[in-house]
Amino acid sequence: MAVKVGINGFGRIGRIVFRNAVEHPEIEVVAVNDPFIDPEYAAYMLKYDSSHGVFKGEIKKDADGLIVNGKKVKFHTERDPSAIPWKASGAEYIVESTGVFTTTEKAKAHLTGGAKKVIISAPSADAPMYVMGVNEKTYDGKADVISNASCTTNCLAPLAKVIHDKYTIVEGLMTTVHSYTATQKTVDGPSGKDWRGGRGAAQNIIPSSTGAAKAVGKVIPDLNGKLTGMSMRVPTPNVSVVDLTVRIEKGATYDEIKATVKEAANGSLAGILGYTEDDIVSSDMNGNTNSSIFDAKAGISLNKNFVKLIAWYDNEWGYSRRVLDLLAYVAKADASK
C-alpha cells in the first residue's frame, strides 16, 4: 500500500518531488501546501517545466485542489505549518521543501496537523541526516524530523563511501561545479554578506561556499574532519558535477578504482550510484534518477595514492527521487516496529 504524502512548498524541489512521486510505486501525494500560489497556478507550474519538459500525464484543477492522473490532491495555502490540516487528506509523511523550516523545532509544527513524520529536503542544523545507500540503515525511528541532506552530499557520499571502504580516504577536497538555483540573481543585485552571490547567475562563474563535503562526516562518521569543499556556481540551469580529489591509504591504479566503483554501481548501490564510460556532458544527465553518476573517463590519478574522481548529478531530479526513496524506506521501517 502506498505511503500517503504531503508536500509543503511547491517550488523547484516540491514540484520535482511531485513529478517523481507519480513514477514511484510506493508513494501517493495526497496534499500540497503553498501560501504563495493558488491551485490553478500550481497546476500550470506542475504541467510545464523549462528543465524537465511537459508533465507526462493529466492535470486538472477542481474546487479545492488538483486532480492528477485521476487522483485527488488537496491544496492548502497556509503560512504556518501547524495550521496545515494534513490529517484531513490522510497525509502522514511530509516533505518539507520550503527551505524555511529546516530545524527540528520548526519542522515539528507539521505534527500538529496530523503528520507522523517530516523529511526535510535540505541540510538541517540539528535533524538527523540520512543519505540513501550510505547510512539509511542507521535509522531507528526515534526522530520525528529527519533530513535528506543536500543534493551535493547525496552525490558525494556514495562515491566517498565506496572509495573509503576499499582504499581508506586519508583526506580530500571537493569542488562542486553547480548549476544556478532560485536563490541567485538574474541580474546583479544586493545579496547581504555574500557579495559574489549577488552577481548575475547567467553571466558569471561564481565561487561559493558549501557544507556538502563536511556533511559527509555526519553520514560517514569515519570521514568526519577529513573532507571539506567549495562550490562554483555556473551559468547552466540544471545538472551539476562533483570533483573529489583524495589521498588514499591503500594504493591503487585508476583502472582498479574504476573497477571498484563499477562493481558498486552494478551491485549494492544500483539505482543510487551510476557509472559511465561515455563521453557525456552535463545536459546528458538531465532527468537521471541516480544520486551520483561516476564519469570514468573524466577522472585522473597523479599516483597510486592521489586521485581526482568526477561524478555528475541532476541536482533536481536525482535528489528528489532520493527524498522519496528515503521516505518510503522510513515508512516501511516505522511500520515494522
From Swiss-Prot:
<comment type="pathway">
    <text>Carbohydrate degradation; glycolysis; pyruvate from D-glyceraldehyde 3-phosphate: step 1/5.</text>
</comment>
<feature type="binding site">
    <location>
        <position position="181"/>
    </location>
    <ligand>
        <name>D-glyceraldehyde 3-phosphate</name>
    </ligand>
</feature>
<feature type="binding site">
    <location>
        <begin position="150"/>
        <end position="152"/>
    </location>
    <ligand>
        <name>D-glyceraldehyde 3-phosphate</name>
    </ligand>
</feature>
<feature type="binding site">
    <location>
        <begin position="210"/>
        <end position="211"/>
    </location>
    <ligand>
        <name>D-glyceraldehyde 3-phosphate</name>
    </ligand>
</feature>
<feature type="binding site">
    <location>
        <position position="34"/>
    </location>
    <ligand>
        <name>NAD(+)</name>
    </ligand>
</feature>
<comment type="subunit">
    <text>Homotetramer.</text>
</comment>
<dbReference type="InterPro" id="IPR020831">
    <property type="entry name" value="GlycerAld/Erythrose_P_DH"/>
</dbReference>
<protein>
    <recommendedName>
        <fullName>Glyceraldehyde-3-phosphate dehydrogenase</fullName>
        <ecNumber>1.2.1.12</ecNumber>
    </recommendedName>
</protein>
<feature type="binding site">
    <location>
        <position position="79"/>
    </location>
    <ligand>
        <name>NAD(+)</name>
    </ligand>
</feature>
<feature type="binding site">
    <location>
        <position position="233"/>
    </location>
    <ligand>
        <name>D-glyceraldehyde 3-phosphate</name>
    </ligand>
</feature>
<feature type="site" description="Activates thiol group during catalysis">
    <location>
        <position position="178"/>
    </location>
</feature>
<feature type="binding site">
    <location>
        <position position="315"/>
    </location>
    <ligand>
        <name>NAD(+)</name>
    </ligand>
</feature>
<dbReference type="GO" id="GO:0051287">
    <property type="term" value="F:NAD binding"/>
</dbReference>
<keyword id="KW-0324">Glycolysis</keyword>
<dbReference type="InterPro" id="IPR020830">
    <property type="entry name" value="GlycerAld_3-P_DH_AS"/>
</dbReference>
<dbReference type="InterPro" id="IPR006424">
    <property type="entry name" value="Glyceraldehyde-3-P_DH_1"/>
</dbReference>
<dbReference type="InterPro" id="IPR036291">
    <property type="entry name" value="NAD(P)-bd_dom_sf"/>
</dbReference>
<keyword id="KW-0560">Oxidoreductase</keyword>
<keyword id="KW-0520">NAD</keyword>
<feature type="active site" description="Nucleophile">
    <location>
        <position position="151"/>
    </location>
</feature>
<comment type="similarity">
    <text>Belongs to the glyceraldehyde-3-phosphate dehydrogenase family.</text>
</comment>
<dbReference type="GO" id="GO:0050661">
    <property type="term" value="F:NADP binding"/>
</dbReference>
<dbReference type="GO" id="GO:0004365">
    <property type="term" value="F:glyceraldehyde-3-phosphate dehydrogenase (NAD+) (phosphorylating) activity"/>
</dbReference>
<dbReference type="GO" id="GO:0006096">
    <property type="term" value="P:glycolytic process"/>
</dbReference>
<dbReference type="GO" id="GO:0006006">
    <property type="term" value="P:glucose metabolic process"/>
</dbReference>
<dbReference type="InterPro" id="IPR020828">
    <property type="entry name" value="GlycerAld_3-P_DH_NAD(P)-bd"/>
</dbReference>
<dbReference type="InterPro" id="IPR020829">
    <property type="entry name" value="GlycerAld_3-P_DH_cat"/>
</dbReference>
<dbReference type="GO" id="GO:0005829">
    <property type="term" value="C:cytosol"/>
</dbReference>
<feature type="binding site">
    <location>
        <begin position="12"/>
        <end position="13"/>
    </location>
    <ligand>
        <name>NAD(+)</name>
    </ligand>
</feature>
<dbReference type="Pfam" id="PF02800">
    <property type="entry name" value="Gp_dh_C"/>
</dbReference>
<keyword id="KW-0963">Cytoplasm</keyword>
<dbReference type="Pfam" id="PF00044">
    <property type="entry name" value="Gp_dh_N"/>
</dbReference>
